[in-house]
Amino acid sequence: MKNEISPKIKCGVAGVGYLGQHHARIYNSLDACDLVGVFDPNEENRLKVSNEQGCDVFNNLEELGEACDVVSVVSPTDLHAEVAIPLMNQGCHLLIEKPLCVSINEAEDILKIAKQNQSIVQVGHI
């Protein structure tokens, strides 16, 4: 049987503060992953992690979503839905840091959009 090489999963991180920098480092260390890049509204954070991990820096969420198959959402909790929904609408699968969001309504919205786009959403407990 012939061994087929699967393409690497194109990963990104939205929010590279304290926890997000660890997501970037871990993706960068996994053979099955290609850390494509990072986005953070704080330019200093995104440039620091981009330089440390040797990946691209994206100036907005839309650019990150276009480049990735999977994105870790590591923004402040009250922004999780605001960050996650557009990424899923771009076809990304997500790892969202705990907690998923701040309300039942936001959770229902995330679930609805995930189903519509056949996006996998996992809540991370790093």
Predicted regions located by residue number:
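Rossmann-fold dehydrogenase core element
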Residues: 109-126
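N-terminal Rossmann-like dinucleotide-binding module
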Residues: 1-52
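Structural signature of beta-strand start/N-cap positions in the alpha/beta core
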Residues: 10, 34-35, 67-69, 93, ...
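Glycine- and other small-residue-rich loops at beta-strand/loop junctions that grip anionic moieties
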Residues: 16, 73, 99, 124-125
